[in-house]
C-alpha cells in the first residue's frame, strides 16, 4: 500500500564493506526500486539502501549510478506505456489510467529522490545534472507523455466537449482533468510546460471550433440569440474555472468573446440595442453593454444607441409651412424635448464605466445625447434654432395663464436649454430669441422672474457673449418698472383719464430700429403730447445727460369706449390709436383729413383705417361714400364676446416704400454695427495678448474665437480693424502694412 508518510533516513555511521563491488551495490539499489514500484516496502531497509548509495557516490561511482538508474527507469516507464496504450479502449478510461499512473509515478519518484539525496548533493549539483526527482519527471515526460500525447490530448478534448454538450458540470470529470492539467503544467522541456506548448493551443482551437458550431444566429431572434450566448458563456466560465488556471481561463474567455460576440452578435448588436431601447429595458441594455469589457465593443453598442436616438429624432417631422409655422415649431420642439428628456432619463440608469467617447471621458450619457442632437441639428440648418426659440416663447407665454403649472413649465424650459447648447446655428437662435423676448417684455406676455431665470440658464450653455444684451433688456424692464412707480406718484402725471406706463430702453440692446421715420412728424393728440412732455421733464431732472427719443412704432395704447352693445377696452398700435382718438372731436373723416390732422403718410393711414373698418373682430369704424369720397366714422353697433379687443399691432405699420427702405436699411445697419463692436472687442483682446500679428494670423485667431458665435465676413473684419486703427487701439507696421501692432 502506498503511504504518504515521510521517510526519514539518517546518515550512516560506517561505510560498510568498502570492497563491495558496484554491481552488487547496484543490485541492492535496483531491488529497492523494484519494491518501491511494486509498493512492497514493508521489508525494505531504507537505511541499508541509503548506505549503499552513499558508498557508491563516495567511491566516485556517481556518474555510473546516475546513468544506470536513468536506463532502468526508462525500461520501467516503457513497460508501463505499452500497457497503457494496449488498454486504451475508451477516452474516459484512458484519462483515468493516465491520471492514476501520474499520481503513482510521482510517489515513486519522490521516494527514489529521497534515497538519492546524497547523490543529488555531491554529484548532480556540482556537475550540473538534473536532480534525481527532476530526472524522473523528465523521463516521464519523454517516455509517457510525449509518446502518448496525441491520444491524451484527443481523449481530453473529446471528454471536455462531451461535458459541454451535456450542459452540466460533472465534478468527477473536472477533477480528473485537473489532475492531468496539473501534470502537463508540471512537465517542462527547454521551451515551456507541455500544457502551454502542446495542449493549450489545441484546447483554444477546439473551443473556437466548438462554439462556432454551437449556435446559428439566423435561426433565432436577436433576444433568443443573446439569451443563448449568455447561457453558453456562463456555462463555459463555470466549467473552465473548475480545472484551468486563471490565465488559461481568461484566454478561453477571449475566444468566446471573439466567436460569440464579434463572430455571432456583431451583425445584430444594433438590432439588440434598438429592441432594448424600444421597450425601455435598462437591464437588457446593461446586459448587452456588459457582454464585453473591450472598448471597441462598448463603443459599438454606444454607436447603436446613438443610431436609435437619431432615427427617432429624424422621424419627428418639421412640417415646414407658413400657415401654421408657429404651431409646427411648438409641436416639433415639444417632441424633441420629450425625446431628449426620456432618453437622458433612460441612459442615466446605465453604467457605462470608463469608456472613452470622442477622446473624452466623463458622463457618457450626456456625451451620447450631445453627439446625436448636435449632429442632427447641424444637418437641419437654421430650422432647429428657429423652432426651439419659438417653443421657449410659447412656454414663457404660458406662465401668464391663470392655471399655469410653473414647475412643469420651468422643467420644459430647463430641458430645452440643454438642446439650445447643442445648436449649430447659435447666432440665429440668439437673433430670434431676442426679438421674441422683446415682444414678451414690451407686451407683458410673460413673468419677468421666469425670463431672468431662463436667461441665466441660457448663459450657462452659451456663455456671456450670447446673453449680455438679453440681460440689458431685462434690466431696462426692471428699471422702467421702478421709474413708472415713481412717475405715478409725481405731480407731473396728473392728467385726468390718462394712464401712462413708459418703457425706457437701451437703444443698442433691443432687436429693432430705434426710430421710425413716421415718428418724426406725427401729430399726437394734445393729452398724449402733454403727458410725453411731462415725462421728458421728469426724466431730464433725474438723468441730466441722457436724451430720450420716442419710438411710437413700439408702443401700445389702450382706449376704453362705450358702444351700443356695451363698454370695451380696445388695444391699438399708437398710430391706429391716434387716428381713433380723432373721432372724439369729429363725427366723420376722410383719409385726406386724417392725414392732415395726424401727418401719418397717406398710404399708412389707408392701411390702418382699413384694418379698423374691415377686420370682423375689430370693426370699430364704418365707412360711407358720398359724392365718390370715402368717409369713416365710429361704428357704435360694434360688438364682441370679449370685453378686451385687440386691433392687430403693427410694429412698422405698412409704411411707404421710401420709409420701408429707410427702416430696413436702419435695421441692417444696426445689426452690422453690433457685430463690428463685438468683433472689435475680440480683436483688442487678441492684440493685447500677442502684441504683433500679421493680417492672416489675426484673421485665423479671430475666426477661431468667433466660429461658435457668428459668421465672420471680410467686410466686417475690415470695418473692425479700420475702427480700431482710427481709435488708436492698433496701428499698421510702417515697413510692412500687412502687420498690426497693439498700442498700449
Curated annotation (Swiss-Prot):
Pfam families: Cullin, Cullin_Nedd8. One of its GO terms (cellular component) is cytoplasm. The keyword Metal-binding does not apply. Neddylated; enhancing the ubiquitin-ligase activity. PANTHER family: CULLIN. One of its GO terms (molecular function) is ubiquitin-protein transferase activity. Component of a ubiquitin-protein ligase complex consisting of the cullin CUL3, the linker protein ELC1, the substrate receptor ELA1, and the RING protein HRT1. GO terms for biological process: global genome nucleotide-excision repair; nucleotide-excision repair; protein ubiquitination; response to UV; ubiquitin-dependent protein catabolic process. Residues 677-736 form the Cullin neddylation domain. As part of the CRL3 E3 ubiquitin ligase complex; polyubiquitylates monoubiquitylated RNA polymerase II subunit RPO21 to trigger its proteolysis; plays a role in global genomic repair. Belongs to the cullin family. Keywords: Isopeptide bond, Ubl conjugation, Ubl conjugation pathway. Coiled coil: none annotated. The keyword Ubl conjugation applies. Present with 172 molecules/cell in log phase SD medium. SUPFAM superfamilies: Cullin homology domain, Cullin repeat-like, Winged helix' DNA-binding domain. There is a cross-link at residue 688 (Glycyl lysine isopeptide (Lys-Gly) (interchain with G-Cter in NEDD8)). This is Cullin-3. Pathway: Protein modification; protein ubiquitination.
Amino acid at each position: 500500500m502506498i503511504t504518504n508518510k515521510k521517510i526519514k533516513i539518517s546518515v550512516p555511521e560506517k561505510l560498510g564493506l568498502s570492497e563491495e563491488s558496484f554491481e552488487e551495490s547496484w543490485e541492492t539499489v535496483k531491488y529497492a526500486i523494484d519494491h518501491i514500484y511494486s509498493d512492497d516496502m514493508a521489508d525494505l531497509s531504507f537505511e541499508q539502501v541509503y548506505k549503499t548509495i552513499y558508498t557508491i557516490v563516495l567511491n566516485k561511482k556517481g556518474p555510473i549510478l546516475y546513468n544506470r538508474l536513468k536506463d532502468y527507469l526508462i525500461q520501467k516507464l516503457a513497460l508501463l506505456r505499452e500497457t497503457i496504450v494496449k488498454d486504451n479502449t475508451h477516452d474516459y478510461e484512458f484519462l483515468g489510467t493516465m491520471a492514476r499512473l501520474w499520481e503513482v509515478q510521482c510517489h515513486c519518484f519522490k521516494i527514489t529522490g529521497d534515497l538519492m539525496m546524497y547523490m543529488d548533493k555531491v554529484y548532480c549539483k556540482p556537475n550540473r545534472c538534473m536532480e534525481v526527482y527532476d530526472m524522473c519527471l523528465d523521463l516521464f515526460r519523454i517516455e509517457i507523455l510525449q509518446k502518448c500525447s496525441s491520444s491524451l490530448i484527443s481523449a481530453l478534448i473529446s471528454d471536455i466537449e462531451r461535458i459541454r454538450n451535456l450542459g452540466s458540470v460533472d465534478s468527477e470529470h473536472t477533477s480528473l482533468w485537473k489532475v492531468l492539467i496539473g501534470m502537463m503544467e508540471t512537465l517542462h522541456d527547454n521551451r515551456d510546460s507541455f500544457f502551454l506548448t502542446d495542449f493549450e493551443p489545441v484546447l483554444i482551437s477546439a473551443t473556437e471550433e466548438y462554439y462556432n458550431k454551437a449556435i446559428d444566429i439566423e435561426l433565432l431572434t436577436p433576444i433568443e440569440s443573446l439569451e443563448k450566448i449568455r447561457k453558453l458563456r456562463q456555462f463555459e466560465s463555470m466549467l473552465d474555472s473548475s480545472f484551468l488556471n486563471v490565465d488559461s481561463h481568461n484566454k478561453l474567455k477571449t475566444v468566446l468573446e471573439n466567436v460569440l460576440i464579434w463572430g455571432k452578435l456583431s451583425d445584430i448588436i444594433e438590432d439588440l440595442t434598438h429592441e432594448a431601447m424600444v421597450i425601455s429595458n435598462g437591464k437588457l441594455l446593461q446586459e448587452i453593454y456588459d457582454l464585453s469589457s473591450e472598448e471597441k465593443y462598448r463603443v459599438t453598442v454606444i454607436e447603436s444607441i446613438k443610431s436609435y436616438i437619431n432615427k427617432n429624432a429624424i422621424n419627428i417631422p418639421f412640417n415646414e409651412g407658413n400657415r401654421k409655422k408657429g404651431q409646427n415649431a411648438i409641436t416639433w420642439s415639444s417632441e424633441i424635448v420629450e425625446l431628449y428628456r426620456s432618453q437622458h432619463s433612460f441612459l442615466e440608469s446605465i453604467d457605462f464605466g470608463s469608456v472613452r467617447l470622442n477622446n473624452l471621458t466623463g458622463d457618457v450619457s450626456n456625451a451620447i445625447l450631445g453627439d446625436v442632437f448636435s449632429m442632427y441639428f447641424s444637418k437641419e440648418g437654421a430650422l432647429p434654432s428657429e423652432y426651439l426659440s419659438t417653443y421657449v416663447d410659447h412656454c414663457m407665454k404660458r406662465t401668464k395663464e391663470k392655471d399655469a403649472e410653473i414647475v412643469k413649465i420651468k422643467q420644459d424650459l430647463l430641458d430645452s436649454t440643454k438642446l439650445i447648447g447643442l445648436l449649430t446655428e447659435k447666432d440665429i437662435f440668439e437673433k430670434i430669441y431676442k426679438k421674441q423676448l422683446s415682444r414678451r417684455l414690451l407686451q407683458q406676455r410673460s413673468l419677468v422672474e421666469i425670463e431672468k431665470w431662463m436667461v441665466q440658464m441660457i448663459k450657462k450653455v452659451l456663455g456671456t457673449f450670447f446673453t449680455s444684451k438679453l440681460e440689458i433688456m431685462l434690466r431696462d424692464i426692471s428699471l422702467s418698472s421702478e421709474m413708472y412707480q415713481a412717475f405715478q406718484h409725481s405731480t407731473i402725471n396728473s392728467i385726468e383719464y390718462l394712464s401712462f406706463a413708459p418703457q425706457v430702453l437701451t437703444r443698442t440692446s433691443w432687436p429693432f430700429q430705434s426710430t421710425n421715420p413716421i415718428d418724426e412728424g406725427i401729430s399726437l393728440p394734445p393729452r398724449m403730447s402733454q403727458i410725453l412732455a411731462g415725462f421728458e421733464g421728469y426724466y431730464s431732472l433725474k438723468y441730466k445727460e441722457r436724451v430720450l427719443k420716442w419710438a411710437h412704432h413700439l408702443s401700445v395704447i389702450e382706449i376704453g369706449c362705450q358702444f351700443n352693445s356695451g363698454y370695451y377696452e380696445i388695444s391699438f398700435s399708437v398710430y391706429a390709436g391716434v387716428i381713433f382718438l380723432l373721432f372724439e372731436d369729429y363725427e366723420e373723416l376722410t383719409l385726406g383729413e386724417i392725414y392732415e390732422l395726424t401727418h401719418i403718410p397717406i398710404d399708412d393711414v389707408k392701411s390702418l383705417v382699413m384694418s379698423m373698418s374691415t377686420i370682423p373682430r375689430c370693426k370699430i369704424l364704418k365707412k360711407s361714400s358720398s359724392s365718390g369720397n370715402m368717409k369713416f366714422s365710429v361704428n357704435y353697433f360694434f360688438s364682441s364676446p370679449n370685453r378686451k379687443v385687440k386691433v392687430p399691432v403693427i410694429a412698422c405699420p405698412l409704411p411707404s416704400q421710401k420709409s420701408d427702405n429707410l427702416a430696413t436699411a436702419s435695421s441692417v445697419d444696426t445689426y452690422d454695427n453690433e457685430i463690428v463692436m463685438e468683433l472689435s472687442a475680440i480683436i483688442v483682446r487678441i492684440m493685447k495678448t500677442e502684441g504683433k500679428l500679421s493680417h492672416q494670423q489675426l484673421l485665423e485667431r479671430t475666426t477661431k474665437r468667433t466660429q461658435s458665435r457668428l459668421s465672420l465676413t471680410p467686410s466686417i473684419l475690415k470695418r473692425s480693424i479700420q475702427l480700431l486703427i482710427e481709435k488708436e487701439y492698433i496701428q499698421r507696421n510702417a515697413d510692412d502694412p500687412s502687420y498690426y501692432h497693439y498700442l498700449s
